[in-house]
């Protein structure tokens, strides 16, 4: 049985999800072997008859919900104008998983993964219809001097691992395969900073959903069945004025962020300013909090005086991501903007759709 066939046959019990298939899938991914003993699947299928299970067709997502790693490379590129460029990118879509497996085998414990996304205009040019229901160009927010800017970007690569050499090697091979088809507009190498702190000293990603909740908040479901298992991702590159930030007393920094610096505890609502970062980036709908999955990474060049945060947020719809930016840059209410923006400037901004892993391979045939 081929890997693709197995992935599409996921046995779901009414009393819970059978997870044994994941161990087989992980084995196949590690070894690269495209066949396996079907006795496990046969056994699970027979159990489904007696335990009220249903076999459903659920696309495998890309590695959107992978744990935060120690290193990452973010590459944003534009598609070149030649017709051959589009053809090359489409064919390349089928090679991403294989290249990732090949490089990952060098350090099996390195947790190497790659997520690939496409902008609205790139999707239309590369794949046409149908298209993801909520995919559109990045929307700018804010006013002059405090703006979430939109910058060119047709293709996103988010490469993660616990070692930078794995990220570097995979990025090298992926970009080599795209030679002549794209032009890189931004590339950032991010690193884990102590106990998952941002470059400004506060823990980042504290409120990230995990497990099933992460999948619920990040992966498209029945609302757009053709693209189920996909995700929307928004990226921004922020530069920080570290001198001005470090001139603030710790207590003042905590009021800007809305959390304590050392212990990473959220300030009580009675003392947390309404324009603190945590207050304005908490999104609710119909009285319920809507989470996004952040995988931000610090980056910098101390010799050049450059210190930054690469923001990357995944969600099942662009809506909470854009609401967050509106709260930050316009303010809630308008004028009550995120105080962190007095020390941080967004210099890039793009929105992409991340197709499921299954669909990504199928797109090569369009």
Tell me what each language-model feature is:
Residues 6, 21, 30:
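Cationic, low-complexity basic patches in intrinsically disordered or flexible, solvent-exposed regions
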Residues 10-13, 20, 49:
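Short, positively charged and aromatic/hydrophobic N-terminal segments
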Residues 41-44, 48-366:
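Long, histidine/aromatic-enriched segments associated with O2/redox biology
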């Amino acid at each position: 049985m081929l890997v693709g066939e197995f992935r599409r046959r996921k046995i779901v019990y009414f009393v819970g999800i059978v997870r044994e298939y994941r161990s087989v899938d992980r084995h196949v991914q590690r070894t690269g072997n495209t066949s396996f003993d079907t006795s496990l699947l046969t056994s699970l299928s027979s159990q489904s008859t007696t335990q009220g299970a249903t076999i459903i067709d659920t696309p495998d997502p890309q590695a959107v919900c992978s744990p935060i790693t120690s290193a990452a490379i973010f590459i944003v590129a534009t598609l070149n104008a030649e017709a051959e460029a589009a053809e090359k990118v489409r064919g390349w879509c089928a090679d991403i998983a294989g290249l990732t497996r090949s490089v990952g085998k060098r350090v099996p414990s390195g947790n190497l993964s790659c997520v690939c996304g496409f902008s609205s205009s790139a999707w239309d040019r590369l794949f046409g219809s149908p298209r993801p229901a909520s995919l559109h160009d990045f929307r700018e927010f804010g006013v002059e001097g405090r703006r979430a800017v939109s910058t060119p970007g047709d293709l996103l690569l988010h490469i993660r691992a616990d070692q930078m050499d794995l990220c570097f090697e995979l990025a090298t091979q992926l970009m080599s395969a795209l030679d002549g088809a794209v032009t890189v507009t931004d590339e950032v190498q991010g690193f884990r900073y102590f106990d998952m702190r941002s470059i400004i000293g506060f823990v980042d990603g504290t409120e990230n959903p995990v497990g099933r909740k992460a999948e619920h908040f990040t992966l498209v479901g029945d609302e757009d069945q053709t693209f189920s298992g996909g995700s929307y991702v928004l990226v921004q590159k922020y530069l920080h004025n570290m001198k001005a930030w470090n001139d603030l007393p710790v207590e003042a920094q905590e009021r800007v962020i809305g959390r304590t610096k050392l212990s990473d505890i959220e300030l009580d609502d009675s003392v947390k300013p309404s324009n603190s970062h945590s207050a304005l980036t908490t999104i609710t709908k119909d009285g319920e909090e809507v989470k996004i999955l952040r995988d931000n990474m610090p980056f910098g060049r101390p010799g050049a005086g450059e210190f930054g945060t690469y923001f990357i947020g995944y969600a099942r719809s662009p809506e909470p991501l854009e609401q967050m930016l509106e709260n930050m840059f316009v303010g809630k209410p308008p004028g009550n903007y995120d105080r962190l923006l007095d020390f941080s400037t967004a210099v890039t901004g793009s929105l992409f759709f991340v197709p499921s892993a299954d669909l990504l391979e199928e797109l090569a045939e369009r």
